[in-house]
């Protein structure tokens, strides 16, 4: 007769992080929100596409706010209170994502704009002809 093997699963230890860093990448087609610790370890992430928005609706401010709220709610449930924000990109969801973080219950301390600005580097995309 076979013996039963008892497995004892270790509980994953999650340390309480009170201060986090939110990285908001707002492109012309999507908005991605990643919340990390001060060291850079990812705690939660969300994007407009991951929230169920498809196609042209991903670039809307409503989708960006929803993505920020989803990422922030998981961190608030783990005990996070304050957050520093790094914003990158020139999309429509920049300010809406900040509102989503605030509405989820996080206290925003610093907002930094880290959009990369070329010193005449790569050639930009051609102008649209409609």
Swiss-Prot record:
Task: Give the taxonomic lineage as stored in the record.
Answer: Eukaryota, Viridiplantae, Chlorophyta, core chlorophytes, Trebouxiophyceae
Keyword Magnesium part of the UniProt annotation: no
Q: Can you name one GO molecular function term for this protein?
A: structural constituent of ribosome
- Report what the protein is called: Small ribosomal subunit protein uS11c
The UniProt entry, under NCBIfam families, shows: PRK05309.1, uS11_bact
Q: Which HAMAP family match?
A: Ribosomal_uS11 (MF_01310)
Pfam families named in the record: Ribosomal_S11
Localization annotation: Plastid, Chloroplast
Please give the SUPFAM superfamilies that the UniProt record associates with this protein. Answer: Translational machinery components
Q: Which GO terms describe its biological process?
A: translation
Quaternary context: Part of the 30S ribosomal subunit.
Instruction: State the superkingdom.
Output: Eukaryota
One Gene Ontology cellular component: ribosome
Q: Show the InterPro entries listed in the entry.
A: Ribosomal_uS11, Ribosomal_uS11_bac-type, Ribosomal_uS11_CS, Ribosomal_uS11_sf
Q: Which family does it belong to?
A: Belongs to the universal ribosomal protein uS11 family.
Keywords on this record? Chloroplast, Plastid, Ribonucleoprotein, Ribosomal protein, RNA-binding, rRNA-binding
**Gene3D superfamilies, per this entry?**
Ribosomal protein S11 (3.30.420.80)
